């Protein structure tokens, strides 16, 4: 601790606390997590766990700087120093994007530059709208006199323009309010769909009263609110997203005490016309020093503070849904949802006609012809909104942002991990989430583009896929180190200053050995098996990852919407159809992927490797591999230049020591020598790479099937992201047959079939040509037959999208080969082409393999690998192991056995590196050149 200086306390809870520190004599910031222990043995155990976490090396994991024990009086403090992420956490970022997007698109973010313009703050919107809606001849005369030389015609024109601006601003605020109403439990929305026209007081000096149906009165003081909006120095947008108790009722709002009016009136001076914020059950209230408390004097409860960049706006409460000049029509959405899925609340906002007689006639509600026209032009409107999505959603996608104060409310930060689950799921109310109807015209910018919230409130597409890809890479590095995070959530995913993803908070991480049990994590992200207190493992992280992806796409933050997918799955209330309706049609693949990750059966969830090989990430992985290749070239070039310069400088120093006087000619010669040395070294480095490639190709083993040389061990230079693995499609089958045909050229079983092991010299000479024909015909037939019978055909592609490796898997329940009837028919069709002798050899091979498999284990509930092959030029890069790992890990999660049949010791060595062992050896006497058939298997570890 003597090396660090505490800057501020970030969070406290239970036995642990988090500090923002900086190293003495340095301005670099770090995050230090301290945990107190009474016993030295427990502290040492925690130290060992922290050291194992520090071994994880990944750019997408929060870096551990230092881990040490500090003796503090009678207690021991375990201190973990980690890098500080300037970008904050992902939940802060998502919520700030929500607020900034609305403010940006509504034009409210220019409020600071237009403080004198009454149309740009909430108070003047209310006042001007009421004045314009209640115009009469006396008010018109007053306005004309106050304007000096302006004529009555100019006054009426100004009033009309102001009225239009007010309606647009009201629509902006209404869109903002309607979005955040998704964070309000459904009970509080009952009876609030119809708004009542406000009554205007003739005396402008009195507070203006705005009354709504089924909600308490709100009193806005004309003078105080304007001053407060301009006098706030912290620039905080305040609003509320739920009520006080966990059981919500609209009657509680109606039957509130009379003193509530005075409280509301008092809170208006603090810019808080809000209800209460109900923190999720897993969050704890922590008072952070140096930050303003979220509890405002005179408010009815917790007020959520959102820091905005330019203004202070007192948002209309979503619970009370007051708005002037707007009316919400409660219509039935064509996309109805399930029992616990989000309630669809279409928001058709239309302008209300003013309630006064005036010479200027305003528009009324849309007529039947207008409605018909709107329906006819819906698709064009939808297409235009999709086309302009990049302009409407957050344009500053990758821009650095300051930490939002929304989660300065410590209730939104995590508790100590051992206390994170203390509320019963049954006590949590179901909450609606708003999916705006495409036909609802929110008219954010005051034009007729009919933009909707789903268009406005969405992460930029490229940023979304980049972030989830980086998160997956971070989780992959965790699982590769045999760890399970167990507390993946958006609050534990951080952003660096350059907006790169960093996964942190490993307080609940466990070493993966066998399956684990016990409840751990954050309720809204917990998988069903954890909620049911069953055994769990890495699939629990996959489930949490699916929850995070859902949050990032829909911006429905689960701790605020009070939604638990795990609980819905357990109760059988999860509606897949309604879930997919929250995604655009063009993004159906990501919806399907998330649904797979949220599968109730943990054995059916994809592994992190399978997720990374999804087609969604192909382009990103190609870009990353190209970038990594470029970095390697730059690094190699830079190192060679550095070495050449150091060598030349050493030569110059030696010459200086021998000669005291150096003339200009010698200097010129030495500089020329330096340049020449650089060129020579660069050429040498390039030539060395070519020599290595040639040596590699020359040293390739001719055995093209399952040998250590043909498959290759993963070398230190192997980069997984240079290749893409995926399941093959129908148009890939011909290329797959070619790869297998070339790879099995020297494989023992095909050597026997082609006659290469025969004692007859003439047969040996014909074996090369015959073997090529046999392999080509056999694999063309076999690959198509396996594809038709739903075998798993995996392929690995290089950066040019060329197929370089193929693996054929039979899934549990299959016999390991295509149906015998179909196979016999196909083989008999080859009889006229190859003759009876060749077909007899094929039959011998197949019967011996089948015998070996049955003698080992006759169960069909296994993953069996009949064929795998890699192109010759890629056999020493570890492509074979890379291609097989996803299915092997998938089998581990499903607790299934993996089997393969091999014919040589080299092939045994290859599979041993993947965890397979020889389970049975079948001695062979009737196959020349083959002494034994080995059945290798890997049983599930849990």
From Swiss-Prot:
Keyword Cytoplasm: no
Compositionally biased residues, Polar residues: 288-303
Keywords: ATP-binding, Coiled coil, Kinase, Nucleotide-binding, Serine/threonine-protein kinase, Transferase
Biased composition (Low complexity): 258-272, 353-367, 410-432
Residues given in the record as ATP binding sites: 10-18, 33
Catalysed reactions, semicolon-separated: L-seryl-[protein] + ATP = O-phospho-L-seryl-[protein] + ADP + H(+); L-threonyl-[protein] + ATP = O-phospho-L-threonyl-[protein] + ADP + H(+)
Residue ranges of every copy of the Protein kinase domain listed in the record: 4-617
Gene Ontology molecular-function annotations: acyltransferase activity, transferring groups other than amino-acyl groups; ATP binding; protein serine kinase activity; protein serine/threonine kinase activity
Regulation: induction: Down-regulated by phagocytic stimuli.
CDD domains: NAT_SF
Primary enzyme class: transferase
SUPFAM superfamilies cross-referenced by the UniProt entry: Acyl-CoA N-acyltransferases (Nat), Protein kinase-like (PK-like)
UniProt keyword Coiled coil, yes or no: yes
Coiled coil: 675-703
Family from the record: Belongs to the protein kinase superfamily. Ser/Thr protein kinase family.
Protein name: Probable serine/threonine-protein kinase DDB_G0279719
